[in-house]
Amino acid sequence: MKKWSYAKLMTSALLLVFLSIILLAFHGGSRGDNHLYDHVAIGTKDILMGRKLKDLKPKTESLKMINPKKKNGFEYSDQVSSDLSRQEVFVDMMARDYQGPKPRSKPLKNN
């Protein structure tokens, strides 16, 4: 085999490996959805049961309803419904416990 053909073969092989790595790296990030997840705080009983909320009725008007056709509050993923939105709602544990900024106590003066 000539030197120039060996160099072309090695370059082509390395380019193929590089492109394969790039394609595999970006393949895992796309799951066919729009990657917009709504973070909602729910009770610890539901978290311990491992349930994911599928549909949630907002408590304030500033929140956008995920599924406006739903009449009762919310429905879990293990309950069957024909009008469920396919967008999953993930639990945000910190939102449930957050009560605003905590006041800082004044530093003690050592005289």
Swiss-Prot record:
Tell me one GO biological process term: root hair cell development
Expression across tissues:
Expressed in the root portion above the meristem, in sepals and pollen grains, and in cotyledons and leaves lamina, stipules and petioles.
Endpoints of the signal sequence:
1-32
What is the deletion mutant like?
Shorter and fewer root hairs.
Pro-sequence residue ranges: 33-96
According to its record, what are the GO cellular component terms? extracellular region
- Keyword field: Differentiation, Growth factor, Hydroxylation, Secreted, Signal, Sulfation
Q: Which GO terms describe its molecular function?
A: growth factor activity
Q: Which residues carry this modification: Hydroxyproline?
A: P107
Domain of life, per UniProt, equals Eukaryota
Where in the sequence is Sulfotyrosine found? Y98
* PTMs per UniProt: The tyrosine sulfation is critical for the function of the peptide.
The UniProt family comment states: Belongs to the RGF family.
Give the misc comment: 'Golven' means irregular waves in Dutch.
Q: What is this protein called?
A: Protein GOLVEN 8
Species this chain originates from: Arabidopsis thaliana
Q: What gene is this protein a product of?
A: GLV8
